């Protein structure tokens, strides 16, 4: 299976002169959804920044292998003067999407996430949930080879969560790779093919759910139970 992303992070980021992240190595393959999980402050966001080329004091190597990608950040951000539709039109222009195809994709996504009625309004006035849905729409619009997603479930209602998960599954089937950072382990357990667990700035556990269960000695138990045992005990 083709690797879309190969990340070798020897070190990245500093807090009070201390390295935030050391010796994290991960890869994402075509048609695969990979979960990046860890406690608050473990170094997940620093890993994402390093992968995107935004981390200070980075040492290592990031290989995208000629693939396009879309980034969905944890905190939505929009141009104050642009409407929802103008945001989508800008993305379409940047990615060279033909006008007819853009209109079809945009309208379909707006209907899926129930934002069609506000497409000519300013996103900066939207609720957190509506802004989060627009961030998802912007990423899905370009149909990239890979997605890097940071805490996507924050602010989403149950219906939007279900539709988002369905979209991820469809993109996987299309062949897209997905790296998703999340605290929502019950959902991650159901949809992720593999996991990378970061604790105290280092990669300490990785593999499929079965691998994680075997390494923690919790056969048949939930990802949350395995994660709790792993971070509370010795590194495995």
Curated annotation (Swiss-Prot):
ATP binds at residues 38-45. Its EC number is 7.-.-.-. It is an enzyme of class 7 (translocase). Pfam families: ABC_tran. Signal peptide: none annotated. InterPro entries: AAA+_ATPase (IPR003593), ABC_transporter-like_ATP-bd (IPR003439), ABC_transporter-like_CS (IPR017871), ABC_Transporter_VariousFunc (IPR051782), P-loop_NTPase (IPR027417). Gene3D superfamilies: P-loop containing nucleotide triphosphate hydrolases. GO terms for molecular function: ATP binding; ATP hydrolysis activity. It comes from the Bacteria. Residues 4-225 form the ABC transporter domain. Keywords: ATP-binding, Nucleotide-binding, Translocase, Transport. Belongs to the ABC transporter superfamily. This is Uncharacterized ABC transporter ATP-binding protein YthP. It comes from Bacillus subtilis (strain 168). The gene is ythP.
């Amino acid at each position: 299976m083709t690797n879309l992303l190969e990340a070798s992070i020897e070190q990245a980021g500093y807090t009070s002169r201390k390295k935030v992240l050391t010796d994290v190595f991960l890869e994402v393959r075509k048609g695969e959804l990979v979960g990046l999980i860890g406690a608050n402050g473990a170094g997940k966001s620093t890993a994402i920044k390093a992968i995107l080329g935004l981390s200070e004091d980075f040492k290592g190597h990031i290989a995208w292998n000629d693939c396009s990608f879309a980034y969905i950040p944890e905190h939505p951000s929009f141009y104050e003067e642009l409407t929802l539709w103008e945001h989508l039109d800008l993305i379409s222009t940047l990615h060279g999407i033909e006008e007819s195809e853009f209109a079809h994709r945009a309208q379909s996504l707006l209907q899926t996430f129930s934002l069609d009625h506000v497409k000519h309004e300013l996103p900066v006035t939207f609720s957190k949930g509506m802004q989060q849905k627009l961030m998802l729409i912007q990423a899905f619009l370009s149909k990239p080879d890979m997605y890097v997603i940071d805490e996507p479930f924050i602010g989403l209602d149950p219906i939007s969560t279900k539709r988002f998960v369905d979209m991820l599954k469809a993109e996987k089937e299309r062949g897209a790779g997905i790296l998703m950072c999340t605290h929502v382990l019950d959902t991650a357990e159901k949809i992720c093919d593999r996991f990378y667990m970061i604790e105290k700035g280092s990669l300490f556990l990785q593999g499929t759910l079965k691998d994680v269960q075997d390494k923690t000695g919790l056969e048949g138990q939930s990802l949350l139970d395995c994660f709790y045992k792993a971070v509370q005990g010795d590194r495995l």
